[in-house]
Design a protein with these regions (language model features):
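Extracytoplasmic/lumenal domain signature
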Residues: 1-146
């Protein structure tokens, strides 16, 4: 093992940038971590009080996006861990939870699925502006891990 980093809770969904930095969320600590390619903590961003299960995603400008169990979506600067913006999803606690991954399309849209059966498309470089649509059957969760 080259290095080992211990988070405050269950570590989920590591992603790696072009220079080898690793970013991951931890459920118990409700945080997003940045760890250097040699295993040293670069920064830690603590989200609100909800557990964080969502796979983060990195855009071509170096911004990281992730969500938590309340449906809040964060945009974080990967160089320093500072919050760029956040937005709250619409809906009740049950159908607004973000329990899976996100993806970024070629059109610079962030696509997010919610446990209540909705998928949102959010313009990420112009600030949060979204359109939402429902999926028959509901409960879109675990798309990247189940």
């Amino acid at each position: 093992t080259k290095w080992n980093f211990e988070a405050n809770g269950d570590a989920y969904a590591p992603i790696v940038d072009k220079i080898g930095n690793v970013y991951f969320v931890d459920k118990g600590g409700k945080s997003l971590y940045a760890v250097s390619k040699d295993g040293q903590l670069k920064w830690k961003f603590a989200s609100e009080s909800a557990p964080t299960y969502c796979f983060p995603v990195l855009d071509d400008k170096g911004n990281i996006y992730f969500g938590n169990g309340t449906g809040r979506i964060y945009a974080i600067d990967s160089s320093n861990g500072e919050e760029l913006w956040h937005m709250d999803s619409e809906g009740t606690d049950n159908n607004a939870k973000i329990m899976s991954g996100m993806t970024i399309g070629d059109n610079q849209m962030l696509y997010v699925s919610y446990i209540g059966g909705n998928v949102a498309a959010i313009k990420i470089f112009a600030g949060p502006e979204k359109s939402t649509w429902s999926c028959r059957g509901g409960n879109i969760h675990g798309t990247n891990q189940y």
